[in-house]
Amino acid sequence: MSIGKLHKQAKEKVDRSQVYPIGEALALVKEVAHAKFDETVEISVRLGVDPRKADQMVRGAVVLPNGLGKDVKVLVFAKGEKAIEAKEAGADYVGGDDLVAKIQEGWFDFDTAIATPDMMGTVGKIGRLLGPRGLMPNPKVGTVTFEVGKATSEAKSGKVEYRVEKAGIVHAPVGKVSFDAEKLQENLVALFDALVKAKPATAKGTYFKKMSLSSTMGPGINVDLPTVQALVK
């Protein structure tokens, strides 16, 4: 059967006018995934914030309890003892000017970048290359730190960075369709809890406006927010 027909069948199983309790939504996102690869499950949350205002920016990171189901390649800008610490924690690439030179030549074979504060002068040379790709180390999400061992371990175990976009929407992965629905739910709740804690003090009115789930190639599934909020401690 063609990809087009499979996608059409998947869309027909989802009622776009309905909001599904989180348990049903997770079961459905697994059911309608039709690609030949292990699709990523993503959530999209619309928040009642205006990201154009500096005091309403929602940004942070959270370690998902069940990881992301993929091998995360970690690059660390560090030297001396900190370079050794990063390597021992499992970093895939550790260095300084040598890595900067590779990146300037167009090499981006890594998923996340971490740097010690004293290396940021070096990293700054490639900020215009890393920034647009979401790879620039940032202290707000714990990727500019002297605790490179801890940061590397967290990245390897499934740390997800999130940031609200122009329309007040946060997109983030919560696992793979091959995950048990329970594991996906645990990851989703961890991310949702992080968003609750990241609520700006200046945000007025309803904070969580809308939420949907989808797999990489699948249709969006609207989620009943109260069924998620009930799971957050």
From Swiss-Prot:
Keywords: Repressor, Ribonucleoprotein, Ribosomal protein, RNA-binding, rRNA-binding, Translation regulation, tRNA-binding
Taxonomy, superkingdom: Bacteria
Cellular component aspect of the GO annotation: cytosolic large ribosomal subunit
GO molecular function: rRNA binding; structural constituent of ribosome; tRNA binding
SUPFAM superfamilies: Ribosomal protein L1
GO biological process: regulation of translation; translation
RNA-binding keyword on record: yes
Presence of keyword Electron transport: no
Function: Binds directly to 23S rRNA. The L1 stalk is quite mobile in the ribosome, and is involved in E site tRNA release.
Family: Belongs to the universal ribosomal protein uL1 family.
Quaternary structure and partners: Part of the 50S ribosomal subunit.
Stated name of the protein: Large ribosomal subunit protein uL1
Organism whose genome encodes this protein: Syntrophotalea carbinolica (strain DSM 2380 / NBRC 103641 / GraBd1)
